[in-house]
Amino acid sequence: MAMTTEVKDELSRLVVKSVSARRAEVTSLLRFAGGLHIVAGRVVVEAEVDLGSIARRLRKDIFDLYGYSAVVHVLSASGIRKNTRYVLRVANDGEALARQTGLFDMRGRPVRGLPAQVVGGSIGDAEAAWRGAFLAHGSLTEPGRSSALEVSCPGPEAALALVGAARRLGVGAKAREVRGADRVVVRDGEAIGALLTRMGAQDTRLVWEERRMRREVRATANRLANFDDANLRRSARAAVAAAARVERALEILGDTVPDHLASAGKLRVEHRQVSLEELGRLADPPMTKDAVAGRIRRLLSMADRKAKVEGIPDTESAVTPDLLEDA
């Protein structure tokens, strides 16, 4: 998950001047990384993230934008927890923060998707919503056939809100349920790059694009190499088959074969792997590849006619599966 960490590290250091965008990011981050809990009759807002820089950014924005203090607890890696996690908690002013960020609606009920002010906000707010969601639960895989930018969502409503925000940014994203969990996925390489830039991870996009291009060049080279290998194998098998047929033709015709056809046939048998053009140069006197091909074709035709009349195996009988397998 190295690329994921690179994206999150860059986004956590991004300077955002728009107050509206900062609010949208905080709201989205709390929605996708956190939860609302009732502790001793009070609403507590929590968010769990995987980088200390994200927790510090969120704590600072909550204080700067809303004036509430948050406490960050560090959960060290141990047992089933592979990595250190950071839990941000707003206890004393949890309900007020939930209302102001839009996590509660006007009647005090939890909002299941994203608040209307974020969904219907500016393009900068849509970018911020994606930034917050990715900082909360996003992942980016290495470029390849299964590369994807993905966000785990707290529910289908939040997933649909994120898909809508992506659409406003000109990015095609799909909401999916995988093993009972809601996710939003972007798979197209160009779309992933565009979304990284929109969120503010331009440096990481350049690294990702470079790796993507390297992989595509390597894949193209491999395909061409495989194509060339296949062509060489086909050519080798065709040459072996032709030599075997010519050999059988000379056996069938014996002393009755015309000299000019016999010389062309013997060249093919003696030089099984060379091209018709090279066979022509080896002939005495030299001749064109079309002339060589024509003589070999007449030799095979003459032998096959004689084999048919005499009821013996023709030249094709010399081309066995074992012969081609060894070619």
UniProtKB/Swiss-Prot annotation:
The species this protein was found in: Mycobacterium ulcerans (strain Agy99)
Protein origin, superkingdom: Bacteria
GO molecular function terms attached to this record: DNA binding
Keyword Cell cycle found: yes
UniProt record, GO biological process: cell division; regulation of sporulation
Functional summary from the UniProt entry: Involved in cell division and chromosome segregation.
Matching Pfam families: HTH_WhiA, LAGLIDADG_WhiA, WhiA_N
Gene: whiA
DNA-binding region listed in the record: 275-308
Listed NCBIfam families: DNA_bind_WhiA
Protein name as catalogued: Probable cell division protein WhiA
